Amino acid sequence: MANSASSRKRARQAVKRNKHNSQIRAKVRTFIKKVTYALEAGNKEQAQNCFTIMQKMLDQAVNKGLIHKNQAARKKSRLNSQIKAL
C-alpha cells in the first residue's frame, strides 16, 4: 500500500495508464482480427482497408512502447503477404 502522497499519486497514475494502454492494445488486436476475418472471407478490398488502419494503430502502439517494433513489423509483414496472395 502506498504511504506517501507521491507514491499514492504514482499508484493512481499507474492505474490510469494501465487502463489507457489496455484500450489501445485491445483496439490493435481488434483490427488484426478484422483483417484476418476479411482474409478468411476472401474480401481483399475490405482486408486492405482494415490493414491500412491497423498499420497506423500498430505504429502508434510501437511509438508509445506498448508493442515491440519487431512484433509490429512481423504482424504487418505476415498480414500483407496474405493480402497479396488473395
From Swiss-Prot:
Pfam (any one): Ribosomal_S20p
UniProt GO BP: translation
GO molecular function: small ribosomal subunit rRNA binding; structural constituent of ribosome
Annotated stretches, region: Disordered: 1-25
Matching SUPFAM superfamilies: Ribosomal protein S20
Feature: compositional bias, Basic residues: 7-25
Keyword flag Membrane: no
Keyword Ribonucleoprotein: yes
Cellular component per GO, a single term: cytosol
Swiss-Prot/TrEMBL keywords: Ribonucleoprotein, Ribosomal protein, RNA-binding, rRNA-binding
Role played: Binds directly to 16S ribosomal RNA.
Family classification: Belongs to the bacterial ribosomal protein bS20 family.
Entry protein name: Small ribosomal subunit protein bS20
Natural source organism: Vesicomyosocius okutanii subsp. Calyptogena okutanii (strain HA)
